[in-house]
């Protein structure tokens, strides 16, 4: 059985596995489309997908039934301000106490850092599934992209 600290450590290791020498807008498009395809093929709930890179919104898609992107924005802010996945922040809440009641942050899974040359330069966000499933979908897509390289 995994404790909170084991999950937290695993999320940090996971972040180091999926990084980029050079991320591009083209990769953002590939990531976003892949996420949409998986959700559709597996008949999952409708999701919103948002990818921010170097302060630019480079991809956003709200599937039919999604009307707001506020959770996506909150997850992106959580990632960009922490430098970690929003799931890591969720597991490590004691260090982010001031964010818990701040509605500009989202203390749950579904936001993932774009790490380029060791620096967090963006965020990949999915919202609409259970928060752990949002996180795992992002990791799955990043793993598939890594395996294809």
Regions found by a protein language model. Name each.
Residues 1-115, 119-146:
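Flexible, solvent-exposed loop/hinge segments and secondary-structure transition points
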